């Protein structure tokens, strides 16, 4: 279960006891069980429909480095992960699906906007539809500290479409030089990791599922993860290690030590103690060594 968020969605989706009290009701609103129930039923319906309508498919994928779309939102000079993975799924029935992984907050629109929107993701979808894709699926990468803060010209729907079109341009380029996914099976792994909470002696166990498809390793992180934490691992193992964040749960932010030292928002909004992000990456690094 992979999610993302814009700054233009409904309130009421987080419970008040969310992560040991790290929950800002003024921002996220009171928990709305009716809204959440509707969302759960919709997701369940989608899962059942997809499972009951499975088809054979040809899957191809490619990578690209994105430019001029996003940067570190605290300091644009800090290096961040700009790798984009594009996956094209061509079903035997004729439908074509685009799945892409890229680390960036879809937050072009500002607080002045009061309309629900998928932000620049809609710009991608519009362009993909022109190329015959029936569905687009976004897997957000390590985006906790990445946004369009220093790259957007203005906070408008037009600008969201422009940046979305720019992301799609990089997707098209990635799919010009592709590899075919040959596997008929997938392999899944799962690793538990204990993380200490700040300002308390308590801790939580988080689960990190890993999906292997051929030589691709998808790591599912149940929080917004800072790019500064995951980038060294991607630099070490290459593009085949793919981080998908806000997956299966939402433990707010996992920030690096520098964010705590500078009191950046990612650290202030994180429920975890300083240094826990680095410990998580150390665990992941060791586990990847075992399974690759």
Model-identified regions with their sequence ranges:
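Conserved beta-alpha junction segments in alpha/beta enzyme cores
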Residues: 1-143, 147-152, 157-162, 175, ...
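Anionic-ligand-binding alpha/beta catalytic cores of soluble enzymes and soluble regulatory domains
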Residues: 167-172
């Amino acid at each position: 279960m992979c999610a993302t968020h814009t700054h233009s969605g409904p309130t009421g989706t987080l419970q008040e006891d969310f992560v040991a009290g790290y929950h800002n009701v003024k921002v996220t609103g009171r928990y709305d069980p009716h809204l959440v129930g509707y969302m759960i039923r919709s997701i369940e319906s989608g899962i059942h429909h997809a499972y009951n309508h499975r088809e054979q498919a040809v899957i191809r994928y490619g990578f690209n480095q994105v430019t001029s779309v996003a940067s570190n939102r605290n300091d644009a000079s800090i290096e961040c992960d700009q790798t984009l993975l594009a996956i094209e799924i061509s079903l035997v029935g004729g439908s074509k699906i685009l799945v892409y992984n890229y680390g960036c907050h879809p937050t072009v629109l500002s607080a002045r906007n009061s309309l629900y929107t998928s932000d620049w993701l809609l710009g991608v979808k519009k362009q993909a539809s022109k190329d015959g894709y029936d569905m687009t699926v976004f897997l957000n990468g390590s985006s906790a500290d990445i946004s369009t803060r220093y790259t957007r010209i203005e906070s408008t729907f037009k600008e969201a479409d422009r940046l979305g079109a720019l992301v799609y341009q990089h997707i098209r380029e990635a799919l010009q030089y592709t590899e075919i996914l040959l596997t008929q099976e997938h392999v899944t792994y799962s690793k538990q990791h204990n993380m200490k909470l700040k300002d308390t002696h308590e801790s939580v166990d988080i689960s990190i599922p890993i999906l292997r498809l051929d030589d691709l390793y998808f790591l599912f992180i149940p929080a917004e993860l800072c790019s500064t934490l995951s980038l060294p691992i991607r630099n070490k193992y290459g593009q085949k290690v793919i981080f998908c964040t806000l997956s299966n749960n939402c433990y707010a932010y996992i920030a690096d030590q520098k964010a705590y030292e500078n009191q950046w928002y990612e650290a202030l909004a994180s429920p975890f103690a300083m240094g826990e992000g680095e410990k998580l990456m150390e665990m992941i690094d060791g586990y990847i060594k075992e399974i690759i």
